[in-house]
Regions:
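Short, solvent-exposed, Trp/other aromatic-anchored flexible loops in extracytoplasmic proteins
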Residues: 72-120
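Short, compositionally biased P/S/T/A/G/V-rich stretches that sit at domain boundaries
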Residues: 3-37, 133-137
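Contiguous beta-strand segments within globular domains
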Residues: 27-41, 48-52, 90-92
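A short beta-turn/strand-edge loop motif at beta-sheet boundaries
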Residues: 43-51, 63-66, 104
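Short beta-strand elements
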Residues: 1-10, 73-78, 119-137
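Beta-strand signatures of extracellular beta-sandwich domains
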Residues: 52-58, 115
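Solvent-exposed residues in well-ordered beta-strands and their adjoining turns
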Residues: 40-44, 58, 96
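Short aromatic-acidic-glycine turn motif
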Residues: 58-70
């Protein structure tokens, strides 16, 4: 019998963890009606670096991408810089309902995924399948 012990050092790269996602519907941002997505997430190893939170939108199956008028996936993002090595962010993403690009009279369920990225576009955390009902009347 041979025993082999393998040790691996912890990753020294940046990490993130999404701690809460809250949806607030029918809010006005100026003269634009939409929804706020309130996020709380922690990052580590990101001091002085840019952190980006993005909401990617889908139909109810959470796999069929919701596309804008240009054929790109509907999304909304916000970036900030981490002031500390370990930082907790509270961030609000505003998604104008018009930006969902749904035909007038459409009603049904949609979903969005939240992803946290570093400044190089590396995905640090993701939470999928946040659903909501939308009616475009």
């Amino acid at each position: 019998e041979i025993r082999i012990d393998i040790e691996q050092a912890a990753s020294s790269g940046p990490t993130a963890s999404i701690t809460s996602i809250e949806q607030v519907h029918n809010v006005m941002n100026g003269f634009v009606k939409g929804m706020n997505i309130k996020l709380k997430f922690d990052v580590s190893g990101m001091q002085g670096r840019t952190v980006r939170a993005t909401a990617w939108f889908y139909y109810a199956d959470n796999s069929t991408k919701l596309n804008n008028a240009y054929g790109n996936q509907v999304s909304v993002s916000r970036s900030d810089t981490a002031p500390y090595e370990n930082t907790t962010f509270t961030m609000t993403l505003f998604m104008p309902y018009q930006g969902l690009n749904m035909a007038y009279g459409w009603s049904g369920s949609l979903t969005f995924d939240i992803a946290i990225y570093d400044s190089s576009g590396n995905k640090l955390a993701r939470q999928d399948n946040n659903s909501f009902t939308f009616s475009n009347f």
